[in-house]
Amino acid sequence: KYRGIPPYEVLSTKWLPYSDVIRLKGVEDMVEVYYNSGQFPATMKLLEKKFARPSEIFTSLAEYYEKNGLTGISHSRLARYEILYRFLEEKEVKVEQSTPAAEEPAGMEQKTGAKAAETAVKLTLADFRDSLMYDLYVRENIKSRPSFASDQSPYKKEVREFFMAEEESPQWLTDYAGFDSKQMAKMAHLEHMEDGTFVLFDYKNRDPLSGNARAVRFRYDQKGSRMVPAKPARI
């Protein structure tokens, strides 16, 4: 069976009932939104570690959208991030509730499926908050922050000092000549992550293929006196 009016779509086949076609369409939509769009690269990498198979990511997301009445709605970019975070919150709660208190008997170390993925890499909601904020800012210097964003006010001093240092002696923002530190802080963005690092998003320098801003990660040196380049803990 198929729709007789545009858009022409298959509704069911000899082998697939209508319910399965709808389910596959939901999975297709999730792949398009969260993978093919290229707007969630860091978060997708983490999700691949959390789930046993990539297909489970999109199947679970499609089920979450359907269960919460989110399908068939034109969501904003920011809303897609909010939805993904709520999905992750729910998954986190389910994992915590299903974690057995006792250790598994000897000889039972080999695990398969989703449980293996959950125990292989201990990912927390903080890891995903960091990856989602990275994905948001690497695309654009957003003005409206999502509800799950961490409070940046405790790090105002560090951010201010970073841009003042760049104004005085540019090291990372060499294409911002003629702009003072306050202007630089508006044109670029420095985000404190929950893993203790800072990420600088440089919107004057973008990847020609993805359009993503150049991102440089920093942490304070052992003396705590200056920021030095750092590798991320998860992303």
Protein language model annotation of sequence segments:
Residues Q39-K94:
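An accessory alpha-helical subdomain
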Residues I73-F179, Q183:
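Hydrophobic, aromatic-lined core segments that form the binding pocket/scaffold
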Residues V10, R129-M133, V199-F201, F218:
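Generic preference for hydrophobic/aromatic residues in regular secondary structure cores
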Residues K1-S55:
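A structural motif corresponding to the C-terminal lobe/cap of the Radical SAM core domain
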Residues I5-Y8, N68, G72, A116:
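Generic preference for well-ordered secondary structure
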Residues D151-I235:
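Charge-dense, extended regions
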